[in-house]
Amino acid sequence: MLRRGRLHVLLALVLAVAVLSAQRAPRPNPILILVSFDGWRYDYIDRLPAPNLRALAARGARAKAMIPSFPTLTFPNHYTIVTGLYPAHHGVVANVMTDASIGARFTMSAETAKDPRWWGGQPLWVTAIAQGRRAAAMFWPGTEVEIQGVRPTYWTPYAKPITSYDRARRVVQWLSLPEGERPSFITVYFDEVDTAGHDYGVDAPELSAAAEHLDDSLGQMIAGVHALGLDDRTTFVIVSDHGMTPLSMDRVIYFDDYVDPETVDVLELHGFLALAPKDGNVDALYRKLRGKHPALAVYKREQTPARLHYRGNPRIAPIIAIPKEGWAATTHRRIENRPLERGAGEPDLRAPMEPIGLRKSETPALHAPPVASDGRLW
């Protein structure tokens, strides 16, 4: 009896230790893969060769489209997606901007863009790392910068020649790392469709070919997740920063018909105008442009429409001029015979959600606490 009693006690202790060990075993981190198809218009999913994207949407949730933040440019909108802040609030208000307090000019390719003072808010990779997770970036605006002293655990400097297939392959390589080294948040950026759209147009066969390449790359990542047995813990979020609107050469506003371009600093052209008078006389420039063309709305910085949420930041150009959808604004000297351009005032990506809301939907997928943002969930 004594031996049997001891055996029972010993067995109970073993079971208790096993239960405690199971309770203490850490659950594997969920994985969030944020994918951007730059320039992917709201209707491309239904009319271009994208079977992997359509299959992914059928298994999950899909919005009809997304309303980009103003301005509908690559850097402002991509950073809005990961911070949940409007461009005027996170500070990256355009692809080209100036800041007197920094004493520099920001452009997408300049070394000055790597100064963390340009980048406000807390992007998702910083949030993930603050929670003890690892993050990886296969290109994304801001990931080459030490924001709040943090870069992604793994990141690749932007290089356009790196193909879509190689970008997808790098993502699968990161996912193949051992559990303790594997990133649980990954961004990957594809620009092939955007380039084809600008160069050839929204109905060109080159655009269809680019879409097929991107969809194949998405399929490559999905297959990699499946092969690694990570299906149940991986969430894909596919986004775009803006759409495309066809233009004709008879819908071009030449602002140098009204203003000498040598007297202004032209920060943005085509989709909208961002202008700073070199002599500092904002009122004079405003009077020269306002009401001069029926398809061009002209505003001072603090008078832009409230719906644009594009006020209150000194990096915003003193004069903002927005063409109607389907129009472009440029100069006679700089006109480029492009078949289309992204919209600005009424962008051709329209539907029930905005990129500021994505941050609130992405954070729970990381099991991370929320941070302050401009977004809301419907």
Model-identified regions with their sequence ranges:
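Loop/turn elements at helix/coil->beta-strand transitions in domains of secreted/extracellular proteins
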Residues: 28-33, 59-63, 131-136, 180-186, ...
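Metal-dependent active-site segment of extracytoplasmic phospho-/sulfohydrolases and closely related
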Residues: 34, 52, 213-255
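Boundary at the C-terminal end of the N-terminal hydrophobic targeting segment
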Residues: 21-24, 130
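His/Asp/Glu-rich, glycine-adjacent segments
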Residues: 85-201, 205, 330
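Short, structured active-site-proximal loop/turn typified by the sulfatase FGly-forming signature C/S-X-P-X-R
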Residues: 43-90
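Active-site neighborhoods of enzymes that stabilize oxyanions during catalysis
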Residues: 267-378
